[in-house]
């Protein structure tokens, strides 16, 4: 594909292309402001010469017309002074108003253009050729869009108006000085040529160092991204010290560059300030001489000095603008060069309706290369869009590349691939994206809920406008209008984007049923059910479900009341100390709903400390905390078996344990009272996370339990109004919105000291849920489970099954999979394959399978070897064929 020149490499061309009208308007306003500035410079001179100078009469003479003039303010210089001061005040307001208005216009224009640039960069990422993502780290792209273009936005508003405005102020002030005396004017500009030559030259060196700094910081961003993505491997292989050394070395290089930049910048500032201060010296010496000689009035000298002082600001602004312009051009070039790459997809036009794909997929001598390496070589094959075809081969056979090529994710560098009689390069991205689905082993999930990820494939365009009240509608129209001005998308993200027509349903209920069917096909229905038990829900939004869950709680309590089950779960009893709950839960008898009761900082909470002191528990908590920490530090120093025991520690993070050692040593040496307030808070926070049945080495006496129950009553009784929304108390008759569905049904703590208590309790709860027909409702609640960054809160198998479900949900004409179920066990893998093939009985499936034996379930098999099609045909025929490539793969399993 031909190279796409997505951006002009000249920043000024980019600015003019998208903002020339706004720039012209700001320029006009700037030009209009200059006469008022000039007039303001003349007023101080008039005050000195016509009011304060005793040689002048006590009135102001107006200009004469036809020899007749009018004398103003006769007889009183005070009123004359008031008049001139009022005029000066008016000019101050006018000039300040112009400056405010121009600055607001500049700021708005700069922000609009920055928004446009960031949007265009993000849009370009969406159109990057997929192989390019292997060469560019996400850290680099994120840094370029968020940080590197930030200064560019600030400069865009200043690009034309600042040189014009500040240059206009400078020239106006210089012109005014020349009008007082030409020699003073020459003195005012005598040093500018020196500054104009030296300072830009030094700034060029600063820019060169700036480019080096940007390159180094991109590498640092890439390394940080690697650290985040490989955190598990770094921890598993204990290579943290190596990573720290590598990071320190990189930051050392950045430090050296930045220090050189600072040295040059401050030298430039020193040089500029030094040369600038020479001009007043020339004014005082030469101008004073002229006043003494009577060749210049005192008012003119004072006005010239005031004007010269006004020269400093615009001159410095011009120099600063020049530096910013050079920096911005440099940053802009570096960013857009990284985005002007070959193979970028063209911008597509919106398509409302996409016709189904029909006919045949035909590859003829298709070759795929990447960075000079041939991945597929002269591949030819054909399949009907009603066939189910397996692709088998070794790991490096090219079967995964073949799948990507058929899905339109990589394009043939030579040869052809036709789908439904049309070359794949001619098919719009909308056709490929809506009529073909692709799933790989590493298919990612978006940050969001399970439902967000499943329904993501149905969000091609807004299909239903959002419902707004009149006030919200006006605000939204204004926001979308601003987006249009900034060249951003104007589709309303709050509109209904889920296209029910794709599924052949009409409403939310139909969508839920279609989703449940798809989850069942992908063998992940039980996974989502289990996730549903782990979510919290909003009582106001789902009152019917809450009522049904409260019935489940009552049924669960009835079953647990049986003597055989009574010890499985310790209920939330207001009058009992709960051995399987933390000390914080025992004291509060509630769950925290705000950061005010952060479990890691309860020792700092003034109200909690007041309750401890009131009930005489503070010293006991301190001793428990010191004892627990002492045991942990002893285990940590033990290594071996001690290290294994530390893996179960929940009261303190292991990487923070060394921070407590000086505190424990100090308390042992000098007593707990020797600890200061911050140190006591750290120790007191530890016991709150202690669960008695888990940390069995901590003895919990009956007297301590009694005092904890007193503290529970005191905590609830004295809770300040401002903190009442920060906790939600355990109430047997009320649904707790801070607890998961599972914990709301159990409404207690599973016994940690009883073998298989959790399994028995879960089985009992499953029976209750089935009896009350809550299973599907909990699965629907599971749609709201947050999957984490890239699905990090899910297992690899769960991520793969959800990816398969997501792809099949959009009802594609062709489903392409590349080893999409590698994390599944054999039984689950077989169920998913069979269910998908059954669902796609009359549609196309191309599946690059991990095991060759899986291919026996498909209509046909394509065998890949070394990037070529080794053979193809029916599985049974190829299996029987002597010396076939398929039989060799089967023997290798």
Identify what each model region corresponds to.
Residues 23-34, 161-212, 285-296:
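Transmembrane helices of ABC transporter permease
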Residues 88-95, 192-197, 265-279, 285, ...:
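Hydrophobic alpha-helical segments in the permease module
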Residues 136-139, 212-260, 327, 332:
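Loop segments that connect adjacent transmembrane helices in multi-pass transporters
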Residues 339-387, 838:
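Primarily ABC-family ATPase nucleotide-binding module
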Residues 407:
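Helix-to-loop junction immediately C-terminal to a conserved catalytic motif
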């Amino acid at each position: 594909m031909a190279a796409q020149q997505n951006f002009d490499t000249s920043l000024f061309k980019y600015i003019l292309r998208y903002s020339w009208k706004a720039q012209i308007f700001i320029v006009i306003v700037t030009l209009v402001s200059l006469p008022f500035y000039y007039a303001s410079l003349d007023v101080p001179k008039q005050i000195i010469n016509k009011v304060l100078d005793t040689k002048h009469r006590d009135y102001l003479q107006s200009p004469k017309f036809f020899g007749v003039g009018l004398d103003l303010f006769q007889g009183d210089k005070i009123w004359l002074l008031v008049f001139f001061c009022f005029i000066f005040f008016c000019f101050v307001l006018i000039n300040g108003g112009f400056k405010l208005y121009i600055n607001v216009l500049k700021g708005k224009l700069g922000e609009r253009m920055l928004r446009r640039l960031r949007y265009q960069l993000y849009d370009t990422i969406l159109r990057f050729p997929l192989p390019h993502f292997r060469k560019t780290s996400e850290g680099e792209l994120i840094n370029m869009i968020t940080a590197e273009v930030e200064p560019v936005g600030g400069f865009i508003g200043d690009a034309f108006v600042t040189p014009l405005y500040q240059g206009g102020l400078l020239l106006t002030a210089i012109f005014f000085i020349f009008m007082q005396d030409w020699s003073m004017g020459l003195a005012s500009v005598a040093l500018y040529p020196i500054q104009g030559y030296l300072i830009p030259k030094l700034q060029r060196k600063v820019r060169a160092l700036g480019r080096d700094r940007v390159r180094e910081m991109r590498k640092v961003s890439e390394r940080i991204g690697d650290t985040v993505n490989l955190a598990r491997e770094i921890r598993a292989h204990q290579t943290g010290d190596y990573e720290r050394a590598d990071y320190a070395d990189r930051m050392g290089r950045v430090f050296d560059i930045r220090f050189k930049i600072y040295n040059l910048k401050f030298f430039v500032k020193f040089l500029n300030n030094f040369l600038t201060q020479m001009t007043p010296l020339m004014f005082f010496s030469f101008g004073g001489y002229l006043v003494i000689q009577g060749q210049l009035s005192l008012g003119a000298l004072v006005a010239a000095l005031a004007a010269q002082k006004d020269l400093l600001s615009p001159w410095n602004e011009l120099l600063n603008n020049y530096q910013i312009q050079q920096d911005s051009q440099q940053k802009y070039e570096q960013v857009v060069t990284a985005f002007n790459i070959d193979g970028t997809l063209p911008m597509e036009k919106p398509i409302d309706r996409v016709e189904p794909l029909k006919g045949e997929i035909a590859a003829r001598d298709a070759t795929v290369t990447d960075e000079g390496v041939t991945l597929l070589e002269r591949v030819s094959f054909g399949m009907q869009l009603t066939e189910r075809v397996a692709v088998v081969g070794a790991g490096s056979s090219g079967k995964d590349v073949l799948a990507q090529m058929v899905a339109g994710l990589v394009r043939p560098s030579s040869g052809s691939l036709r789908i439904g009689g049309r070359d794949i390069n001619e098919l719009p991205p909308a056709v490929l994206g809506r009529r073909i689905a692709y799933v790989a082993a590493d298919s990612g999930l978006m940050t969001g809920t399970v439902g967000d990820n499943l329904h993501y494939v149905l969000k091609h365009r807004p299909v239903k406008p959002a419902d707004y009240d009149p006030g919200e509608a006006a605000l939204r129209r204004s926001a979308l209008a601003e987006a249009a001005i900034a060249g951003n998308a104007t589709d309303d993200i709050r509109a209904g984007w889920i296209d029910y027509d794709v599924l052949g349903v009409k409403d939310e209920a139909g969508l839920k049923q279609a989703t449940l069917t798809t989850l069942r096909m992908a063998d992940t229905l039980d996974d989502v059910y289990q996730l549903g038990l782990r979510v919290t829900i909003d009582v106001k939004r789902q009152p019917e479900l809450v009522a049904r869950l409260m019935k489940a709680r009552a049924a669960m309590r009835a079953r647990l009341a049986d003597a055989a089950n009574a010890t499985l779960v310790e209920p939330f009893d207001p009058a009992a100390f709960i051995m399987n709950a933390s000390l914080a839960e025992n004291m509060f008898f509630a769950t925290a709903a705000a950061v005010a009761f952060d479990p890691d900082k309860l020792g700092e909470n003034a109200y909690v400390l007041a309750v401890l002191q009131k009930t005489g528990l503070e010293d006991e908590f301190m001793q428990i905390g010191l004892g627990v920490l002492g045991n942990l530090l002893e285990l940590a120093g033990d290594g071996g078996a001690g290290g294994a025991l530390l893996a179960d520690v929940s009261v303190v993070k292991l990487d923070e344990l060394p921070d407590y050692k000086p505190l424990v040593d100090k308390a042992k040496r000098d007593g707990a009272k020797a600890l200061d307030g911050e140190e006591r808070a750290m120790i007191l926070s530890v016991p709150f996370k202690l669960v008695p049945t888990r940390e069995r080495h901590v003895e919990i006496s009956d007297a301590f339990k009694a005092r904890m129950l007193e503290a529970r009553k005191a905590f609830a009784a004295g809770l300040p109004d401002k903190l009442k929304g920060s906790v939600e108390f355990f109430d047997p008759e009320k649904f707790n919105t801070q607890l998961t569905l599972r914990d709301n049904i159990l409404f207690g703590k599973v016994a940690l000291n009883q073998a298989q208590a959790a399994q028995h309790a879960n089985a009992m709860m499953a029976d209750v849920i089935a009896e009350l027909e809550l299973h599907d409702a909990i699965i629907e609640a599971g749609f709201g489970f947050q999957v984490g960054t890239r699905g990090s809160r899910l297992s690899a198998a769960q991520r793969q099954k959800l990816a398969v479900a997501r792809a099949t949900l959009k009802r594609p004409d062709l489903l392409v999979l590349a080893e999409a179920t590698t994390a599944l066990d054999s039984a689950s893998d077989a169920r998913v394959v069979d269910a998908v093939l059954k669902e796609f009985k009359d549609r196309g499936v191309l599946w690059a399978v991990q095991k060759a034996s899986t291919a026996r379930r498909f209509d046909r098999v394509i065998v890949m070897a070394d990037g070529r099609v080794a053979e193809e045909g029916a599985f049974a025929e190829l299996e029987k064929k002597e010396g076939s490539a398929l039989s060799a793969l089967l023997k290798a399993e």
